[in-house]
Swiss-Prot record:
GO molecular function, one term: magnesium ion binding
UniProt function note: DNA-dependent RNA polymerase catalyzes the transcription of DNA into RNA using the four ribonucleoside triphosphates as substrates.
Gene designation per UniProt: rpoC
Binding site for Zn(2+) 1: 70, 72, 85, 88
Keyword Nuclease (UniProt): no
Binding site for Zn(2+) 2: 822, 896, 903, 906
Family: Belongs to the RNA polymerase beta' chain family.
Cofactor: Mg(2+); Zn(2+)
Name of the protein: DNA-directed RNA polymerase subunit beta'
Subunit: The RNAP catalytic core consists of 2 alpha, 1 beta, 1 beta' and 1 omega subunit. When a sigma factor is associated with the core the holoenzyme is formed, which can initiate transcription.
Cofactor notes: Binds 1 Mg(2+) ion per subunit.
Database matches in HAMAP family: RNApol_bact_RpoC
EC number: 2.7.7.6
Length: 1409
């Protein structure tokens, strides 16, 4: 019967749409949706279970309960379709109309919609220009509002209390009209003339000068203009008719035992209906005003709760004191409609099971349990059974499959052949968390996974589970095979390095196989080819590690792809010779002629991918894996307690450290060092001692004596024992990178060392024992401290990291490659990244896979090596390196001019595929995943490992690392003192060392107060000191000579006298202004200089006198009236007193950068280029004046406790730092521009990741910065429709400007706005995407008022509305549809599109020899 009914169901045509609009509904509109009015609060009759008439579930309004059957049962069957029963009034139709038919409630009194009232900023308040508090007082019947003042002195919109109103009525009678409640607000809205209001505001906007006012007017103007444009009437924000949700969407289900389970909405609706009916009755009875008012207020509250429970006043609760879930709660939050049902759908044809290792699989295969496959591929099996004639109907086929006969298994084998399945492991942090494999059937119930893909899935076999999904359609299968097959995903999209890299056992096996042993069996034998070596090894004539000579065949791949064989004799080991058998043709033997550690193997696979292509590499990786496992098994490496060799020197090292500590303690007791210094030094001593023990241990582990064939110690000619690299199992595991690290081995056999407390501070007594000797109770207890902290941190970290990824994905989800070339000539000048004199990232790494924005010129001949628009691959960057070019301008995502997307040329190479990115690639999501995925590896905060900190602090000089010529940057300033030393007086001077070709080799920051050991333009040798300084104090140096004159230096007021107990010398120390008494707070202790005539020395080229301010904690070393020369020290600041500012590190730092938060005590940048002088100080602030080149002066007030790095008379350029402190990204953007900002964010983010050893390509960060900068602020509206100060999408401004210019108008000018990722996600054009991210209510409220249209450009919106996403193959589909809609036949166009998407099909199963 059911199948028969299906024939009659009308096939509903799927609607095709291009955009979704949201707007306020008018009362008429609501009535037009409705199928009738709900008049009674009853739901269903508890005896008959039939819905009550006119109730919330009424069948007459909403439709029948059963298909094609009216309620009283008079009409049944299909033949009566469409009849309306005259007895019960129910239309005979499908029962599913109860999911779509709405009803309405006619409200007896209008009610304000709470979203437009309470969602901040209040829209009602904005339109009426009345404060929210006042509107609430009117709505909730606490005050009257004047609607029509008539001939009275009252004004429209004025509030009157009850008493006011009565006195005014006595005074003026019925001249004026004042009302309370929603009727009043509705009347005000209805009688408002939007048009004149807008004109008035536009006029005001032009006249006013105050910032705050402009902001306020612009906001109001935006809303009013939206009302005008979209044709939405403001009075619709007040409801007269309330729509009722279809009953199937708020079901009422009878439970056994006569109780009902119901949706909270029914309760909320019942309250509204009850109060509404009561109000109607009261109005009919002409009840006293006060009772009616109370009922109206209750109705307002009931409707408020229905729409958004708990937004105002008390939360409505059900019978069990639980808050009721309102309509707003249904759509927002993680469990709401958007994130739970639209973005988090469950899919059919999927299963999950535990994974086990499948070492015999090929890279593109997985093992699928038979039981699972049978269930997943059921429809295919049914079809096959029918085709083969083994079953006549689906039912018969079903039965056959349930019997699981032999023919079913044969068919299953047939069905899954070449049909890829998708495997996914949660959490899916990047696109490699879902990959396609060809299933092979296995017994048992566990999925078998190829070991090499574990790194991509971050899987291990300790009970992890994975989900299997079946791509059904042919297109889906093809995409899975060409794009997602594991063998096509060799490279990581985050950094372009191979991700299919052997680890653990495989590494150990390969390492063991390629090590060499001295005096091993068969050393020095010669072999004609590898086959002979294999035979000798199999018969035990020669040891795996023996040095032998062998002839090997290698293949050179010519340029034209021809392979040329050459035979060479190599002296190598047996293991390496055997390994050479699996080397792909085209790779030289030299790449494996070394002990293969993990890093080496990674390089090997990378080289293979670049030289012989993906297919050979995949086969090679598989063979490496099989070989590694085989030899790891043969090696039989195991560890025992005797492998942990404790160094004999350990006792003595610890004893000497203890003696040093005792000495420090004695110094502390006698008052020579402070508590802080003592702590730092003790921690430092133990840190060093631990390192020494570790070094001794590693040295002992690293070497062993060689035994000859008889087991005697082998000796060389002089009779000394021969040593070789150790075959100690623990050492081999750590050295090869298979498991463990030097730090862990150190804990096993050295000493555990210093431990951290949960707050990150170091406990100064270290654990001197190791795990081999065992810990005592105290040591064990100290260990638990750090361990517990680690576990707690991990849990927090995972949540935080996931949230960061979510925000990143949300801000970039609509960024897709939409065109090939946007034609811009902009880009970023890129050079090698140098930190502290070391090249952290060379130029070739930074420009690899980018497109040149300008011609790359040969520095010697100035001829074009690579024209602009060239994609720089490995060969090109090597060539650029060889030519010694040190700066290249490359295209970048930041400067791409494509609107709604990005162009392939600006993005450059697709890192996961190794060639120029394809059209339709979702680069935004890839960027977000690449940055978010390593998030869990980042620490929550950087610990100051005390030892590390104090050792870093005691750097006292910079040395050159290479030979070359020294140059100082323009910011370097120094003076020569009486001793002829050159003392640096600039804060950010740098010394650059260039080689003979003038290329920059290294650059070093030279701190203030350092003594230069070299002069500008002179040659230096490697290792030569460039500058030295005292690491423990920061000096304050005078640039001018003269006689010292103190100002405000008063003992006991601004400075305190300190007498050193040991030496008896006294010195003056500046007191913290916060601790000073009343008047003296504003005094600044400073020094002026007088010349021979007693006149104040002036700043060179200026009128201001030289004055040097002493800051907090300064120890003043000069006396009043003392003569000082240039470059002499006036005072010094002890370094330990200036506390190490706690650096935010790890994950919070990355989040802080992407959220573009201004740091707490940010430094100040110069707003203009000019000369600095100091003005008159105010209370607590110092006044700094910059006089620009036109002589205009700009004043800045700076808190006293801030340290001004600039000094009187200094010339600063716009954007230069003048006050110490972390940079504020907003300032960088405003003063130095987008490129500087991008560079700042990229460098800072990379610093955090580099610290953890994570590689991420810069372009991912650039993509995110592009999204953070996509909004602009209008600085001059010109003839466009924008409002001054409005924030809009950059693309919209450009489009609008083009339109205006075409009509010879004046375009709008704008400045870039930097938004944090959360803000940027919420301010996107797509309201669907923003609403599903955060603050759903606010987003939807705003969108409804503006009558917003969502063009469905991003990925997220399309997922939500259930269309193909406009990325990948979906992009071509949408383009074609758009062309079809435009009426252009587009068959050829899609072929061209497909041409752009080069799919590399790797054959299904590469045969492994």
């Amino acid at each position: 019967m059911k199948a028969l009914l299906d024939l009659f169901k009308q096939v509903t045509q799927e609607e095709e749409f291009d955009a979704i609009k949201i707007a306020l509904a008018s009362p008429e509109k609501i009535r037009s949706w409705s199928y009738g009015e709900v008049k009674k609060p009853e739901t269903i009759n508890y005896r008959t279970f039939k819905p009550e008439r006119d109730g919330l579930f009424c069948a007459k309004i909403f439709g029948p309960i059963k298909d094609y059957e009216c309620l009283c049962g008079k009409y049944k069957r299909l033949k009566h379709r469409g009849v309306i029963c005259e007895k019960c009034g129910v239309e005979v139709t499908l029962s599913k109309v109860r999911r779509e038919r709405m009803a309405h409630i006619e409200l007896a009194s209008p009610v304000a919609h709470i979203w437009f009232l309470k969602s901040l900023p209040s829209r009602l308040g904005m339109v009426l220009d009345i404060a929210l508090r006042d509107i609430e007082r009117v709505l909730y019947f606490e005050a009257y509002i004047v609607i029509d003042p008539g001939m009275t002195p009252l004004t429209r919109g004025q509030l009157l209390t009850e008493d006011d109103y009565l006195s005014k009525v006595e005074e003026y009678g019925d001249e004026f009209n004042a009302v309370m409640g929603a009727e009043a607000v509705r009347e005000l809205l209805r009688t408002m003339d939007i048009h004149t209001e807008i004109e008035k505001l536009r006029r005001e906007l032009g006249e006013t000068g105050s910032e705050a006012k402009i902001k306020k007017i612009a906001k109001r103007l935006k809303v009013l203009e939206a009302f005008q444009k979209s044709g939405i009437k403001p009075e619709w924000m007040i409801l007269e008719v309330l729509p009722v949700l279809p009953p199937e969407l708020r079901p009422l289900v009878p439970l056994d035992g006569g109780r009902f389970a119901t949706s909270d909405l029914n309760d909320l609706y019942r309250r509204v209906i009850n109060r509404n009916n009561r109000l109607k009755r009261l109005l009919e009875l002409k009840a006293p005003e006060i009772i009616v008012r109370n009922e109206k207020r209750m109705l307002q509250e009931a409707v408020d709760s229905l729409l958004d429970n708990g937004r105002r006043g008390k939360v409505m609760t059900g019978a069990n004191k639980r808050p009721l879930k309102s309509l707003a709660d249904m759509i927002k939050g993680k469990g709401g409609r958007f994130r739970q049902n639209l973005l988090g759908k469950r899919v059919d044809y999927s299963g999950r099971s535990v994974i086990v290792v499948g070492p015999q699989l090929k890279l593109h295969q997985c093992g699928l349990p038979k039981k699972m496959a049978l269930e997943l591929f059921k429809p295919f099996i049914f079809h096959k059974l029918e085709v083969l004639g083994l079953a006549t109907t689906i039912k018969a086929a079903k039965k056959k499959v349930e019997e699981e006969g032999p023919e079913v298994w044969d068919i299953l084998e047939d069905v899954i052949r070449e049909h890829p399945v998708l495997l996914n492991r949660a959490p899916t942090l990047h696109r490699l968390g879902i990959q396609a494999f060809e299933p092979t059937l296995v017994e048992g119930k566990a999925i078998q996974l190829h070991p090499l893909v574990c790194a991509a899935f971050n899987a291990d076999f300790d009970g992890d589970q994975m989900a299997v999904h079946v791509p059904l359609s042919l297109e889906a299968q093809m995409e899975a095979r060409t794009l997602m097959l594991a063998s096509n995903n060799v490279l990581s999209p985050a950094n372009g390095e191979p991700i299919i890299v052997p680890s653990q056992d495989i590494v150990l096996g390969l390492y063991y196989m390629t090590r060499e042993k001295k005096a091993a069996r068969g050393e020095g034998m010669r072999f004609a080819n590898v086959a002979e070596v294999q035979r000798a090894y199999d018969s035990g004539q020669v040891d795996l590690h023996a040095r032998i000579t062998v002839r090997l065949r290698e293949f050179d791949v010519e340029v034209d792809g021809q392979k040329r064989e050459k035979i060479t004799r190599y002296e190598t080991t047996v293991g390496r010779a055997l390994l050479s058998e699996i080397l792909p043709a085209g790779l030289p033997f030299s790449v494996i002629d070394k002990a293969l550690k993990k890093k080496e193997i990674s390089r090997l696979i990378n080289a293979s991918f670049r030289r012989v292509g993906i297919r050979e590499t995949v086969i090679f990786a598989d063979k490496l894996m099989y070989t590694g496992y085989t030899y790891a098994t043969k090696a039989g490496i195991s560890i025992s307690i005797n492998d942990m060799l404790v160094p004999p020197e350990k006792e003595q090292l610890i004893a000497s450290a203890e003696a040093e500590v005792k000495e420090i303690e004695d110094q502390y007791v006698s008052g020579l060092v402070t508590q802080g210094e003592r702590y730092n030094k003790v921690v430092d001593i133990w840190g060093r001692a631990g390192d020494k023990v570790a070094d001794a241990m590693m040295k002992q582990l690293r070497e062993e004596v060689v035994l000859d064939a008889n087991g005697e110690v082998a000796k060389d000619a002089e009779g000394n024992p021969i040593k070789q690299e150790s075959f100690n199992a623990i050492y081999m595991m750590a050295d090869s990178g298979a498991r463990g690290s030097a730090a862990q081995v150190r804990q096993l056999a050295g000493m555990r060392g210093l431990m951290a407390k949960p707050d990150g501070s170091i406990i100064e007594t270290p654990i001197t024992a190791n795990f081999r000797d065992g810990l005592n109770v105290l040591q064990y207890f100290i260990s638990t401290h750090g361990a517990r902290k680690g576990l707690a941190d991990t849990a927090l970290k995972t949540a935080n990291s996931g949230y960061l990824t979510r925000r990143l994905v949300d801000v970039t989800q609509d960024l897709v490659v939409t065109e090939h070339d946007c034609g811009t000539t902009e880009g970023l000048y890129t050079k090698a990244l140098v930190k502290g004199g070391e090249v952290v990232e060379p130029l070739h790494d930074r420009i690899l896979g980018r497109v040149a924005a300008l011609d790359v010129l040969n520095p010697e001949t100035q001829e074009v090596v690579y024209p602009a628009g060239t994609l720089l691959t490995e060969d090109e960057v090597e060539h650029i390196d060889a030519l010694g070019i040190d700066e290249v301008k490359v295209r970048t995502a930041l400067t791409c001019e494509t609107r709604y997307g990005i162009c392939a040329k600006c993005y450059g190479r697709d890192l996961g595929r190794g060639k120029l990115i394809n059209m339709g690639e979702a680069v935004g999501v890839i960027a977000a995943q690449s940055i978010g995925e390593p998030g869990t590896q980042l620490t929550m905060r950087t610990f100051h490992i005390g030892g590390a900190v104090s050792r870093a602090a005691s750097v006292s000089q910079v040395e050159s690392k290479s030979n070359g010529i020294v140059h100082f940057t323009s910011t370097m300033r120094y003076v020569t003192n009486a001793r002829g030393e050159q003392v640096v007086i600039s804060r950010n001077g740098e010394a650059i060392i260039q080689d003979e070709n003038g290329r920059e080799r290294e650059r070093h920051k030279v701190p203030y107060g350092a003594t230069l050991q070299i002069t500008d333009g002179k040659p230096v040798k490697a290792g030569q000191a460039l500058a030295t300084w005292d690491p423990h104090t920061r000096p304050i140096i005078t640039e001018y000579a003269g006689r010292v004159k103190f100002e405000n230096v008063e003992e006991g007021v601004t400075v305190a006298k300190q007498v050193d107990e040991v030496t008896g010398l006294s010195s003056l120390v500046v007191i913290d202004p916060k601790q000073r008494a009343g008047q003296s707070k504003g005094l600044r202790p400073q020094v002026k200089l007088l010349d021979a005539n007693g006149v104040e020395v002036k700043v060179a080229g200026g009128e201001a006198p030289v004055s040097v301010t002493f800051q907090l904690g300064c120890i003043i070393t000069v006396k009043d009236g003392q003569e000082v020369g240039v470059g002499e020290v006036l005072a010094r600041i002890p370094q330990e007193s200036s506390k190490t500012r706690d650096i935010t590190g790890g994950l919070p730092r990355v989040a802080e950068l992407f959220e573009a938060r201004s740091p707490k005590d940010a430094g100040l940048l110069a707003e203009v280029t000019g000369t600095i002088s100091f003005g008159k100080d105010t209370k607590g602030k110092q006044r700094l004046v910059i006089t620009d080149l036109d002589g205009v002066s700009h004043e800045f007030l700076i808190p006293k406790d801030k340290h001004v790095t600039a000094h009187d008379g200094q010339v600063v350029t716009k954007g230069e730092s003048i006050v110490d402190g972390p940079a504020d990204p907003q300032d960088i953007l405003r003063l130095q521009g987008r490129e500087a900002l991008a560079r700042y964010i990229i460098d800072e983010v990379q610093d955090v990741y580099r610290l953890q050893g994570v590689k991420i390509n810069d372009k991912h960060i650039e993509v995110i910065v592009r999204q953070m900068l996509r909004r602009v602020r209008i600085t001059d509206a010109g003839d466009t429709s924008f409002i001054l100060g409005e924030q809009v999408e950059r693309a919209d401004v450009l489009t609008e400007n083009e339109r205006v210019l075409a009509q010879d108008g004046r375009p709008a000018s704008f400045e870039y706005v930097l938004l944090g990722i959360t803000k940027a996600s919420l301010s996107t054009d797509s309201f669907i995407s923003a609403a599903s991210f955060q603050e759903t209510t606010r987003v939807l409220t705003e969108a409804a008022i503006l009558g917003k249209r969502d063009e469905l450009r991003g990925l997220k919106e399309n997922v939500i509305v259930g269309r193909l996403i406009p990325a990948g193959t979906g992009l071509a589909y949408h383009e074609t549809r758009k062309r079809n809609v435009a009426g252009v036949d587009s068959a050829p166009a899609i072929i061209e599109d497909a041409g752009n998407v080069q799919l590399e099909e790797t054959s299904g199963n590469p045969e492994v020899a």
